Amino acid sequence: ILDCESTVALCCRPHGFGKSMNLSMLKCYLERPVPGSSSVNLFIGSQIWDAEDGIYRDEYARYPVIALDFSTSSYRGADVEAAMRDVVARECARLLPLLDVPDLARSDVRHIERVARGVAGSDEIDSALGVLIELLRMACDEQVVLLVDGYDAAFTNHMQAKGAYG
């Protein structure tokens, strides 16, 4: 993935083939820590850390990472839109500390704060991911990494609940 020149990489594997674990590891490696948090580099001495004389070390803890996980069982039978909005709202709350920089548009930051607190309207929630990506890009002056796990889970669970799938 780190060698990929594409802006998007889709990893399609059957259930149980390690997609979630790989995404979790990518998040741990790439994610810029929230200010004030303590972090320990778990990768020192690992293959990725030592590969090709440390070629990937500059990527460590460098990027703002949005990790959307739709694979949890709590979405079984749930409304697909509600499940997606909930996941986005939780990420807004988790990443809000990275937006504590002076040069960001206050109206956009307040937008993300409302989503994070669960008081945003439907339109605000629907646009939150795009706003969050742009704010993180500006706040961190880096590309934003978007990891999506279980992207089909909410839809599949919804269809199974209706008896229309599987």
Which residues are covered by each model-predicted region?
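Residue-level preference for the first positions of well-ordered beta-strands
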Residues: 8-10, 65, 143-145
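P-loop NTPase signaling cores
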Residues: 35, 80, 126-127, 133-149, ...
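Conserved alpha-helical scaffold flanking the Walker A/P-loop in AAA+ ATPase domains
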Residues: 49-58, 129-139
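Phosphate-binding P-loop
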Residues: 1-6
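P-loop NTPase motor core
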Residues: 22, 28-98
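Walker A/P-loop nucleotide-binding motif
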Residues: 7-25
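Structural preference for long, well-ordered alpha-helical segments in enzyme cores
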Residues: 22-26, 132, 154
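Conserved P-loop NTPase mechanochemical-coupling segment
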Residues: 70-71, 76-126, 154-164
